[in-house]
Swiss-Prot record:
A Pfam family: Ribosomal_L33
Xref: HAMAP family: Ribosomal_bL33
Gene from which the chain derives: rpmG
Source organism (scientific name): Corynebacterium diphtheriae (strain ATCC 700971 / NCTC 13129 / Biotype gravis)
Name of protein: Large ribosomal subunit protein bL33
Record-stated family: Belongs to the bacterial ribosomal protein bL33 family.
SUPFAM superfamilies named in the record: Zn-binding ribosomal proteins
Amino acid sequence: MARNDIRPIIKLKSTAGTGYTYVTRKNKRNNPDRISLKKYDPVVRKHVEFREER
């Protein structure tokens, strides 16, 4: 099995419209749907929701 089969690299994009992204990995087997996490956006200096971008 290749390294990226089960845990691919994904981008989390800010919903605040700043264009700020986080890069992380996710387990496709445990989380087949798109991820949304609350993380810090330094552009607006707030915690906002980040959604998975494909």
